[in-house]
Amino acid sequence: MPFLQIFLLSIGVAADAFACSVVRGTAIRVNLFKRALVLAGIFGVFQAAMPLIGWVIGRFFAGITFIAEIDHWIAFALLGVVGAKMIWDAFQPEDDETIVDDGRVQFRPAIILGLATSIDALAVGMGLAFVEVSILKVALSMGLITFALSLVGAWIGHHGGGKFGKWATILGGIILIGIGANIVYEHLSA
């Protein structure tokens, strides 16, 4: 998989974490840098680990002969479904919750969000098990880009940018669908 595709894939799966970081950033009143680092670190670790787990699961099924004949469609379906769900979720109403900021790092919500936003990375990892790719490069890229975008997202949210999260999620969904379509196109044109 070329570097540009890995980069775009990483941005696509990082969009949910970015959006959550923007939302969480709007609630941070004190200790922004420390809390943004923790949030970004948790998101980055989950986004790096989940595609590895998904890839292992996918490789288990890739050895089955009939699956090898439709693997490109499986990758497209997984990426397409995840991308479509991201776009759908961006248009759903958000829960209004009152957040009291006491200045402490809140690990439990960050871990729950990290897990929730990395489910798409698990599905992407499963899809990538059916194509020729260095999963370690992909996982590292996903983790680092998610970390960086989550830091930026928390900063944007802290400084009043709550509207960016929705559009980042939509863009991420479009990117994932595009990559899935490209996998099918490359297979059919080979």
Swiss-Prot record:
Keyword Cell membrane attributed: yes
Pfam families: Mntp
Molecular function GO terms recorded: manganese ion transmembrane transporter activity
Keyword set, alphabetical order: Cell membrane, Ion transport, Manganese, Membrane, Transmembrane, Transmembrane helix, Transport
Disulfide bonds: none
Keyword Cell membrane in annotation: yes
Family recorded in the similarity comment: Belongs to the MntP (TC 9.B.29) family.
Major location category of this protein: membrane
Role description: Probably functions as a manganese efflux pump.
InterPro entries membership: Mntp/YtaF (IPR003810), Put_MntP (IPR022929)
Localization per Swiss-Prot or TrEMBL: Cell membrane
Membrane-crossing segments per the record: 3-23, 37-57, 72-88, 111-131, 138-158, 164-184
One Gene Ontology cellular component annotation held by this UniProt entry: plasma membrane
Membrane topology, from the record: Multi-pass membrane protein
Protein name: Putative manganese efflux pump MntP
